Regions:
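Histone-fold recognition with a strong bias for associated Lys/Arg-rich disordered tails
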Residues: 1-145
Length: 145
């Protein structure tokens, strides 16, 4: 974990966003991965009922996304260590969500900023979501409703 990581500051996140990160930890542990990364956050976002109000209005096929994410996670190396590190892609995603928070003038990083930052993630978020027809414009329009 880098010293300036946002994950060291839970008070910078809404409860929903922090809970998303905590549940992502469990996903990483379930896969026996040593790094928690974007591929662990996405399944929680698409399958946990707490995030349905943000996900359900979007033109996404959560089942197809979850299948793709399972395949991706299965291809990642497993580890035997007890330490769980924050992956670089997740750090970059959270930095992007922080930038989105600042632009929006929001007090805390919340799920909408994380969703927008996912569209900037070149490794996994953007390819999966754009292939499903999600765009920043569409996401911003949905968030206004």
């Amino acid at each position: 974990m880098r010293p300036d990581t946002l994950t060291a500051e839970p008070d910078r996140f809404s409860d929903a966003a922090w809970d998303l990160l905590l549940a992502s930890q469990e996903q990483a542990r379930r896969w026996r991965h040593n790094e928690m990364d974007v591929e662990h956050l996405l399944p929680v976002l698409f399958s946990d009922a707490r995030y349905a109000s943000w996900i359900d209005p979007l033109p996404l096929d959560p089942e197809a996304l979850l299948d793709q994410l399972d395949d991706f996670c299965a291809d990642q190396p497993t580890g035997s260590g007890r330490e769980l590190y924050i992956g670089e892609a997740l750090e970059a995603l959270l930095d992007g969500a922080e930038r989105r928070r600042a632009v929006a003038g929001a007090q805390l990083i919340d799920v909408p900023q994380i969703l927008l930052a996912l569209l900037e993630d070149p490794r996994l978020g953007r390819p999966l979501l754009v292939a499903q027809g999600l765009s920043e414009d569409l996401l911003l329009r949905q968030q206004r409703h």
